[in-house]
């Protein structure tokens, strides 16, 4: 298995970068993807809001943006951008640790990179991708 995970912490925030990389690898293993490369970048509100506006015409900070950069029958290649400050706000609202929320978001982004999609709106929480995301998060919490 040749999977490369790169974590870039643009704000120098106190996060367990090795756990974020482990979460990406777990998605690859569980989805039986043997080759790929994913770059995970943690960024602040201003930077991720600018990306959200540029690529999705939404002028607010978001929690995760993912881009799949590979073609069919090519090794998985993609970028996952995590909004650190938005993740912290969400963790506070949900009453969970920031670490747990960041793991959830990196799993979510990695699933998008390998090809998963979900509907918009409230129905997205009932789709296969979200169930898979939560199962992967649960399996990581046992390691």
Regions found by a protein language model. Give the residues of each.
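An acidic/histidine-cluster motif and surrounding catalytic segment
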Residues: 1-102, 111-143
């Amino acid at each position: 298995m040749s999977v490369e995970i790169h974590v870039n912490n643009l704000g120098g925030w106190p996060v367990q970068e090795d756990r974020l990389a482990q979460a990406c690898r777990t998605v690859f293993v569980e989805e039986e993807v043997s080759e790929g490369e994913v770059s995970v970048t943690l960024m602040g509100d201003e930077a991720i809001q600018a990306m959200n506006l540029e690529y999705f015409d939404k002028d607010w900070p978001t929690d995760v943006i993912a881009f799949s950069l590979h073609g069919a029958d090519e090794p998985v290649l993609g970028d996952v951008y995590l909004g650190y400050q938005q993740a912290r706000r969400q963790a506070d609202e949900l009453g969970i640790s920031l670490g747990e929320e960041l793991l959830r978001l990196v799993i979510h982004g990695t699933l998008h990179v390998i090809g998963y999609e979900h509907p918009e709106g409230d129905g997205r929480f009932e789709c296969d991708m979200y169930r898979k995301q939560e199962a992967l998060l649960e399996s990581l919490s046992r390691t």
